[in-house]
């Protein structure tokens, strides 16, 4: 029995915890990339530069989620074939996905670079930070293929039960990013451009090492395979496209909601940007648990160990509850200190008020996001994509309607009131679909 097969052999809570923890730590260090930019820019350049970097965050997260969703979609099939020990099919999916999604990343990178000014203007970015925001975004898109490749390869690693290698690479590149941020921003005085360039270089190094290590791992599975299979690409896209939409739901919501925040001014945007970084840290914990559930479910489904799927779902809910309590305690006790970490001495009373109010509200409702992500992870692992997609679109619609209609009329507080309402509605729809489609009913998996 391969050491990578523990997801189908060990007790579900133990297996999922061992598997998910490196992914959770990886999510933290993924945010270190962006937080390092924000903290260092905020401390050494000022709150306007922080607002410029923060103004890009919602948009860059959408493109990150395209990479994550594409990887998760391919990873479901990789996990299923790995669980069934069909290594030839597994390697065909890997090769086909890497070729297809690398081409996609180049196209998206060119698109983003060319239309950076148009997109930031469309988000109603304040005029005093627009040019710096566009500069940051263009450097980001120049390195987008590196980011895309790293995220795809990271998902491939986790699909075969290996979550420690991408964590190690991410820790290395995060530390490198911090040192380069300090050198380029504080040392060379390159400002927003230096922060973006430091991130690009660190991501490129991480992607290169990931590819070499993953190539070595795949050579251990001695099976013939096709380098590109159109039918397998279609099968991958059937899961990847809804996964991209699901992964993007949160970020698309943030991007459009940011357009609601921007007219409130640069200081309100700085406070919102500071809290959004914190929200991203905790959100990605729950996203990671949901993403860990998918290969657990898919591997056990491929191995025909159906009884373990429900136990794995319950184990994920336990992990979600633990981290929701942790998020609440951290935010309630340290929200002022966390805000000052980003805003520094230049932050106004308005910036601190927006940041503190938003952060405190989120602390009460992260559990909704956790159970939503775990439920979505089971549906995705089983390939039940229709209700999965509907639930996430309802989530987005609720968040946007509350923010767009109420915030301009009644105040900025309605921006964060909309967030848990969408999470709760998403969970209710996903859970109802899951109750009807547990894998004892094999026909449900073909939805």
Which residues are covered by each model-predicted region?
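Small-residue-rich hydrophobic transmembrane alpha-helices
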Residues: 50-110, 147-166, 271-335, 369-383, ...
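N-terminal transmembrane alpha-helices
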Residues: 7-44, 58-73, 77, 102-109, ...
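Helix-terminus/linker motif at the lipid-water interface of multi-pass membrane proteins
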Residues: 28, 32-50, 120-127, 183-190, ...
């Amino acid at each position: 029995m391969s050491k990578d097969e523990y997801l189908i052999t060990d007790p579900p809570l133990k297996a999922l915890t061992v598997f998910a923890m490196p992914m959770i730590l990886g999510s933290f260090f993924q945010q270190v990339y962006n937080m390092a930019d924000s903290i260092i820019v905020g401390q050494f350049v000022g709150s306007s530069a922080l607002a410029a970097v923060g103004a890009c965050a919602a948009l860059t997260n959408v493109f990150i989620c395209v990479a994550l969703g594409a990887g998760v979609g391919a990873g479901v099939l990789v996990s299923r074939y790995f669980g069934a020990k069909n290594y030839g099919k597994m390697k065909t999916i890997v090769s086909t996905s890497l070729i297809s999604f690398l081409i996609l990343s180049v196209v998206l990178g060119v698109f983003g670079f060319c239309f950076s000014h148009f997109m930031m203007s469309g988000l109603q970015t304040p005029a005093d930070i627009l040019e710096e925001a566009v500069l940051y975004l263009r450097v980001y898109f120049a390195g987008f293929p590196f980011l895309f490749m790293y995220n795809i390869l990271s998902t491939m690693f986790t699909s075969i039960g290996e979550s420690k290698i991408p964590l190690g690479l991410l820790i290395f590149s995060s530390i490198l990013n911090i040192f380069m941020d300090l050198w380029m921003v504080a040392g060379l005085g390159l400002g927003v451009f230096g922060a973006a360039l430091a991130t690009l270089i660190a991501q490129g190094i991480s992607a290169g090492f990931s590819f070499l290590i993953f190539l070595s791992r795949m050579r251990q599975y001695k099976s013939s395979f096709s380098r590109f299979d159109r039918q397998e690409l279609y099968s991958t896209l059937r899961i990847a496209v809804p996964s991209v939409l699901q992964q993007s739901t949160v970020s698309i919501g943030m991007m459009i909601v940011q357009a609601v925040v921007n007219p409130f001014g640069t200081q309100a945007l700085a406070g919102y940007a500071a809290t959004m970084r914190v929200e991203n840290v905790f959100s990605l914990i729950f996203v990671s648990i949901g993403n860990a559930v998918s290969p657990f479910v898919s591997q056990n489904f491929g191995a025909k160990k159906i009884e373990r799927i429900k136990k794995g779902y319950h184990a994920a809910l336990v992990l979600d509850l633990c981290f929701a309590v942790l998020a609440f305690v951290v935010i309630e006790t340290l929200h002022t200190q966390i805000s000052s970490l980003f805003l520094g001495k230049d932050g106004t009373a308005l910036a601190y008020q927006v940041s503190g109010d938003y952060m405190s509200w989120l602390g009460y409702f992260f559990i909704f996001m956790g159970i939503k992500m775990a439920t979505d992870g089971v549906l995705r692992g089983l390939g039940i994509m229709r209700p999965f997609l509907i639930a996430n679109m309802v989530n987005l619609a609720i968040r946007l309607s509350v923010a767009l209609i109420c915030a301009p009329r009644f105040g900025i507080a309605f921006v964060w009131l909309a967030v848990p309402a969408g999470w709760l509605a998403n969970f209710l729809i996903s859970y109802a679909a899951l109750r009807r489609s547990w894998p004892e009913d094999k026909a449900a998996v073909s939805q």
